[in-house]
Amino acid sequence: MQETFIELVPRSASSLCEEMRQVEQMDISFQGYNLPELKRQKSSFLSPEHMMQMRKKAELSPEKKLALHLRTQERNVVENIERVRLMAMHGVDIALLVTGDAFDPGEEPATCAHNVLDGITVPMGGIEIAVGADLYMKQWGRWGHKIPAIQKGIVGSTFTQPIFHPQTLASLHENIGNFLPEKVYAGITWISNAKSREYWHRKNNVPAEFLPSGESDETIRYNSISQSADILRLVRQQGFSQYVMLMSGRLEELQQIFSLSENIREH
């Protein structure tokens, strides 16, 4: 069954709860939330442990599914596995293991996500384990190391980098089978300005021709919203689940993308 998740930025407990309240008042059908573990040198965000406690207290929309990211690189394998078990005890549905970006670009992560998977010998009860798929790296980065855990049924799903172009979506179909877990959540987001567009191209290796065109920020945003609506429609037509990343976008733009995707589908 297809599912739609909404990814929100957990800046604070109050802002997260308020955004959830606003999203649930919109005319959008979705099944869950995807909340990242973020670390920035000049910003603070809620930790997964804080969000677990909020979930246990029913402060995080108990009627919706919840996927939480776990950055693996700052902890050893045993500590990461214990965090997954803790998630299961606090009502989290999906543990998304991601290595995470290092503060120092030249720093090698101490523990990659696949190292944690190697330490899990059987599927864990009470929680689904997911991994990220970096669609813009050669051979999807370290993806080959994750395949054994997929084949053993330890990994149940993957959340992809945002898809900006149908050509990227086609690559998912080429790798269905032993290469991908049963459920794929295709990432979707939109770009608000030229600086953000440059970030996706330079930092995340998205081909420039896949990104929205435009000279002004207003034109880039308009084109990106339309492009994201097209991708959302295609993802649904092709049977993938999806998660839509709010990031720095506005809630009314999120509503617009869903509305446009429905309108396009009708024609």
Spans of features found by a protein language model:
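A structural motif
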Residues: 30, 92, 155, 181, ...
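Active-site pocket-lining/capping segments in soluble small-molecule metabolic enzymes
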Residues: 5-27, 96-103, 107-136, 143, ...
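Flavin-dependent oxidoreductase catalytic cores
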Residues: 44-64, 77-79, 125-127
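Glycine-rich, proline-tolerant flexible connector loops at the mouths of alpha/beta enzymes
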Residues: 27-53, 97-110, 155-171, 175, ...
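Active-site glycine-rich loop that binds ribose-phosphate moieties when present
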Residues: 138-153, 168
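Glycine-rich anion/phosphate-binding loops
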Residues: 72-86
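Conserved, mostly hydrophobic/aromatic
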Residues: 33, 87, 150-154, 186
